[in-house]
Amino acid sequence: MLRPPSRSFGVAVSTPPRLRRDAQANLQKLRAAAIAVFSQRGLSAPLEDIAREAGVSIGTLYNRVGSREELIDAVVPDIAGAKLKTLRDRTLSQDSPRSQLETFIAEMIDLQRSDPAMNDAMLRRYPDAVLLINACERSMALGAELVANAHSAGVLAEDFTTDDLMAVLWLAGMASHDPAAPEGWRHVVDRSVSAAWLA
């Protein structure tokens, strides 16, 4: 089985040795602000807003963290780690291949709908944020394993593949944060999965 998202995510910011106390304080403020702003507005939130939330200048932000991707990776454990572990644990607590895959899909869609940052992560909008992509790939690997298990159990149509699972989650991620998306998008997603079950 897939191991839970690692707790050993490194802070990807460039932190000089013996950082001055005020610089350390600024770095902690930036991390806290990034967690808050990214979670509320997604990973594309203006860095100026994060600097403002932290009470520092945008120059200080760039000096301390370097880039958006480095800042994203610095807060991966707080944004994604615990949530993806919870998703994994709830999924694997189910007692059948079908219920595991159903739970995985439902939990993933709920996470995408409720958390703009996680939705951006699952849609891989920042592929250079290496730690974030790695965390998401571990969850997608779990999804692929669940599809294979459902095939082996004879409960899922063979022509419903991992690519179909990714397409379902992509559609949910795009539609859930698009004000122009048709109101019935979730029904379409659910129906596309329901049609693939054999038992």
Predicted segments, located by residue:
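C-terminal peripheral helix-coil segments that are non-catalytic and often amphipathic
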Residues: 1-14, 140-141, 145-153, 168-171, ...
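Basic, helix-initiating cap at the start of DNA-binding domains
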Residues: 1-44, 48-53, 70-73
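Amphipathic alpha-helical segments enriched in hydrophobic/aromatic and basic residues
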Residues: 38, 46-47, 58, 68, ...
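Helix-turn-helix/winged-helix DNA-binding modules
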Residues: 42-43, 63, 157
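Short hydrophobic/aromatic patch on the recognition helix
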Residues: 55-65
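Hydrophobic alpha-helical connector segments
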Residues: 74, 85-114, 128
